[in-house]
């Protein structure tokens, strides 16, 4: 399994599936299954009432997308998606957008 170059907080665009074209920051990553959750992308799920939660019905639940179905949005040109590359700047390894050659700010 390859190491993911997309990190939590990166702004991504969905490139495949029913949510294709939607943009948002990554809220969580499951590394072993390679799933990501993107802010604002939800699925509707039918929930039956239980003893703890007496309210049933249709609820919006954050959708989990496979990491191959999202691509990093270019920080310089917001219309395009890009791949992630690495460069050594001042002795530190930093992530760069391959299309625009700009440094990607890491959200912490």
UniProtKB/Swiss-Prot annotation:
- Stored Gene3D superfamilies: 2.30.30.30
Q: Where are the transmembrane segments?
A: none
Keywords per UniProt? Ribonucleoprotein, Ribosomal protein, RNA-binding, rRNA-binding
Per the record, its GO cellular-component terms are: ribonucleoprotein complex; ribosome
One of the protein's GO biological processes = translation
InterPro entries associated with the record = KOW (IPR005824), Rib_uL2_dom2 (IPR014722), Ribosomal_uL24 (IPR003256), Ribosomal_uL24_CS (IPR005825), Ribosomal_uL24_KOW (IPR041988), Translation_prot_SH3-like_sf (IPR008991)
- From what superkingdom does this record's organism come? Bacteria
Tell me the GO molecular function terms.
Answer: rRNA binding; structural constituent of ribosome
Q: What is its biological role?
A: One of two assembly initiator proteins, it binds directly to the 5'-end of the 23S rRNA, where it nucleates assembly of the 50S subunit.
Assembly with partners or alone? Part of the 50S ribosomal subunit.
Q: Which family does it belong to?
A: Belongs to the universal ribosomal protein uL24 family.
Q: What is this protein called?
A: Large ribosomal subunit protein uL24
What species is given as this protein's source? Mycoplasma capricolum subsp. capricolum (strain California kid / ATCC 27343 / NCTC 10154)
């Amino acid at each position: 399994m390859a190491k993911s170059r997309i990190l939590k907080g990166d702004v991504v665009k969905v490139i495949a599936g029913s949510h294709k074209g939607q943009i948002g920051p990554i809220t969580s990553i499951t590394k072993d299954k390679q799933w990501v959750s993107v802010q604002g992308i939800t699925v509707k799920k039918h929930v039956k009432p239980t003893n703890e939660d007496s309210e049933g019905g249709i609820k919006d639940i954050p959708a989990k997308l496979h990491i191959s179905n999202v691509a990093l949005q270019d920080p310089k040109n917001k219309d395009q998606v890009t791949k992630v590359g690495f460069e050594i700047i001042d002795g530190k390894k930093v992530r760069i957008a391959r299309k625009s050659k700009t440094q990607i700010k890491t959200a912490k």
